[in-house]
């Protein structure tokens, strides 16, 4: 039975595509290209995001269990056509999705990226960068081709009320507000760049001095051999196994669990952010025996550590009032809290989520 996929772009354009459940994500991309045009939506440049996850080309649509009431975000990355030697380096991230594996070097090179006021003066010297170290430049997107980025910013820059709308829109992909704000800041409020940074890593750590030493120690150790999964050590940890099973049962809980992990073990969260593809692949591995979310909440903070800790969620008075209003709809407190934090403390989204879950159960 055919399903209708609702798609939304970063410019708030919404359209629908009819798909057979057996058809793959690649077919969906081809249909998007056919409907919207190869110039605007080339298959090779499309990234489809649902519930904070990038959809893989060879996976059937039915495997992602896309709710027709929700939407899939379409992000298009285009090769820059600006003259000069910066063209090959700008085209490489879009032509080869695997280029994200070179991003562990991005924090080191990204820390020297020019401030906003110096963009125009820096562009000539920036264009010569690929001749010295093309590998690091392709990994550190903002430090190359700043002229091309200014063109992007001129056409897609968001400010004022549009900024808040865009912020909410990107958060709906499953990212924390703080990370979205940081990505928008690093991209000079260019939403395309911001989403790209969230997917591949935000260049330039907000804590360059004391944070860079710890990050280099974390990243150097696992990346000594090419092709090795730096997150392999998580596979044998029961806390991660339980977390994986819960996420597969309800992908909407991933942002809340990652937020909790960031509070308990920020270094591990940084490492996961640098290796999102491997982490998502591990999350998508076949689960074992099903577990309950209540068994996982207290274990998330213990991932990467030897012993679990007790974890408590702190809420403000306003957040408590929002939770009470959601409970008044007739849902149990435990389910309300899960939905509220899974929806990044957005009361309306949480209410819609709870109502849709209730409808599905009936």
Swiss-Prot record:
Occurrences of domain Ubiquitin-like (ranges): 1-81
InterPro entries: Rad23 (IPR004806), RAD23A/B_UBA1 (IPR041811), STI1_HS-bd (IPR006636), UBA (IPR015940), UBA-like_sf (IPR009060), Ubiquitin-like_dom (IPR000626), Ubiquitin-like_domsf (IPR029071), XPC-bd (IPR015360)
Cellular component GO terms, alphabetical: cytosol; nucleoplasm; proteasome complex
Stretches for region Disordered: 80-160, 201-227
GO molecular function, one term: damaged DNA binding
Subcellular location: Nucleus
Domain UBA: 161-201, 317-357
Pfam hit, one: XPC-binding
Superkingdom of source: Eukaryota
SUPFAM superfamilies: UBA-like (SSF46934), Ubiquitin-like (SSF54236), XPC-binding domain (SSF101238)
Biological processes, Gene Ontology terms: nucleotide-excision repair; proteasome-mediated ubiquitin-dependent protein catabolic process
Cross-link Glycyl lysine isopeptide (Lys-Gly) (interchain with G-Cter in ubiquitin) mapped to chain: 122
Keyword list, A-Z: DNA damage, DNA repair, Isopeptide bond, Nucleus, Phosphoprotein, Proteasome, Repeat, Ubl conjugation
Compositional bias annotation for Low complexity: 88-109, 126-144
Modified residues (Phosphoserine): 123, 128, 133, 136, 138, 205, 294, 356
Similarity remark: Belongs to the RAD23 family.
Role played: Multiubiquitin chain receptor involved in modulation of proteasomal degradation. Binds to 'Lys-48'-linked polyubiquitin chains in a length-dependent manner and with a lower affinity to 'Lys-63'-linked polyubiquitin chains. Proposed to be capable to bind simultaneously to the 26S proteasome and to polyubiquitinated substrates and to deliver ubiquitinated proteins to the proteasome. Involved in nucleotide excision repair and is thought to be functional equivalent for RAD23B in global genome nucleotide excision repair (GG-NER) by association with XPC. In vitro, XPC:RAD23A dimer has NER activity. Can stabilize XPC.
Record remark: domains: The ubiquitin-like (UBL) and the UBA (ubiquitin-associated) domains interact intramolecularly in a highly dynamic manner, as each UBA domain competes for an overlapping UBL domain surface. Binding of ubiquitin or proteasome subunit PSMD4 disrupt the UBL-UBA domain interactions and drive RAD23A in to an open conformation.
NCBIfam families associated with the record: rad23 (TIGR00601)
Subunit details: Interacts with XPC; the interaction is suggesting the existence of a functional equivalent variant XPC complex. Interacts with PSMD4 and PSMC5. Interacts with ATXN3. Interacts with UBQLN2.
Name this polypeptide is given: UV excision repair protein RAD23 homolog A
Gene name of the encoded protein: RAD23A
């Amino acid at each position: 039975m055919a399903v209708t996929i609702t798609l939304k772009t970063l410019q708030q354009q919404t359209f629908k595509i009819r798909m057979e459940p057996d058809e793959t994500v690649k077919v969906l991309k081809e249909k998007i290209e056919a409907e919207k045009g190869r110039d605007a939506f080339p298959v090779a440049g499309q990234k489809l995001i649902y519930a904070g996850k990038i959809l893989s080309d060879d996976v059937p649509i039915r495997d992602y269990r896309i709710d027709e009431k929700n939407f899939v975000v379409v992000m298009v990355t285009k090769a820059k056509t600006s003259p000069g030697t910066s063209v090959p380096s700008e085209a490489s991230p879009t032509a080869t999705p695997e280029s994200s594996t070179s991003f562990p070097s991005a924090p080191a090179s990204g820390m020297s990226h020019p401030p906003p006021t110096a963009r125009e003066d820096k562009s000539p010297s920036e264009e010569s960068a690929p001749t010295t170290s093309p590998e690091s430049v392709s990994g550190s997107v903002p430090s190359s081709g700043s002229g091309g980025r200014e063109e992007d910013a001129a056409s897609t820059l968001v400010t004022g009320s549009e900024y808040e709308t865009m912020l909410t829109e990107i958060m709906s992909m499953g990212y924390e507000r703080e990370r979205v704000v940081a990505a928008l800041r690093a991209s000079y409020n260019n939403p395309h760049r911001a989403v790209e940074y969230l997917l591949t890593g935000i260049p330039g750590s907000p804590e360059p001095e004391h944070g860079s030493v710890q990050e280099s120690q974390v990243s150097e150790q696992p990346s000594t051999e090419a092709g090795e999964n730096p997150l392999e050590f998580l596979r044998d940890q029961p806390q991660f196994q339980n977390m994986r099973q819960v996420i597969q049962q309800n992908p909407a809980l991933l942002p809340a669990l990652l937020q909790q992990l960031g509070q308990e073990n920020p270094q591990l969260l940084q490492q996961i952010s640098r290796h999102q593809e491997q982490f998502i692949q591990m999350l998508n591995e076949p689960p074992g025996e099903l577990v309950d979310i209540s068994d996982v909440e207290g274990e998330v903070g213990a991932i990467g550590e030897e012993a679990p800790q007790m974890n408590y969620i702190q809420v403000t008075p306003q957040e408590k009032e929002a939770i009470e209003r959601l409970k008044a709809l007739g849902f149990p407190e435990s389910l309300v809290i899960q939905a509220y934090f899974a929806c990044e403390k957005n009361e309306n989204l949480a209410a819609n989520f709870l109502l849709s879950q209730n409808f599905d159960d009936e």
